[in-house]
Amino acid sequence: MSYNGIGLKTAKGSSTSGHIQRSLADNQAGNVKNFSSRKEESQGRVARASRERKLDGSMAAHADRREIEVRVSELRDELEDADIDAEEIERRCEQLRRQLQSEAAERARVAQAYTPRNARSAGAT
């Protein structure tokens, strides 16, 4: 009832027939001659996936806009708890929103103008 030390000593009470099958999960691991090509292929897939995620700026822009709205919402909650007039709350929230949007635009402008050293050296090789 066991194969290479794997399996049950007896199938009794296990609700199984006790039949042991060869694991198909390690099919590629046993094929040593193609190991290096498989490794290169998998590394290429990981590199392509990370490049594709970096290229999608719409997700980053959405996350930035969402962060701004979360901070505005937190301010609104604090001001409402302090029993401040609704017009004053709107004014302060809009002021914070404009400030955060201008800071985000400045960060984006600086990020676009500046290329990190490791990116410059990677592009040269």
Swiss-Prot record:
It is found in: Cytoplasm; Nucleus. Pfam families: cwf21. Residues 59-114 form a coiled coil. Transmembrane segments: none annotated. The keyword Glycoprotein does not apply. Residues 12-35 have a biased composition (Polar residues). Gene3D superfamilies: 6.10.140.420. Residues 62-103 form the CWF21 domain. Its main location: cytoplasm. InterPro entries: CWC21, mRNA_splic_Cwf21_dom. One of its GO terms (cellular component) is U2-type spliceosomal complex. GO terms for biological process: mRNA splicing, via spliceosome. Residues 37-60 have a biased composition (Basic and acidic residues). The keyword Cytoplasm applies. Residues 1-60 are annotated as: Disordered. Keywords: Coiled coil, Cytoplasm, mRNA processing, mRNA splicing, Nucleus, Spliceosome. Involved in pre-mRNA splicing. May function at or prior to the first catalytic step of splicing at the catalytic center of the spliceosome. May do so by stabilizing the catalytic center or the position of the RNA substrate. Belongs to the CWC21 family. Associates with the NTC complex (or PRP19-associated complex). The NTC complex associates with the spliceosome after the release of the U1 and U4 snRNAs and forms the CWC spliceosome subcomplex reminiscent of a late-stage spliceosome. PANTHER family: SERINE/ARGININE REPETITIVE MATRIX 2 (PTHR36562), SERINE_ARGININE REPETITIVE MATRIX 2 (PTHR36562:SF5). This is Pre-mRNA-splicing factor CWC21. It comes from Eremothecium gossypii (strain ATCC 10895 / CBS 109.51 / FGSC 9923 / NRRL Y-1056) (Yeast).
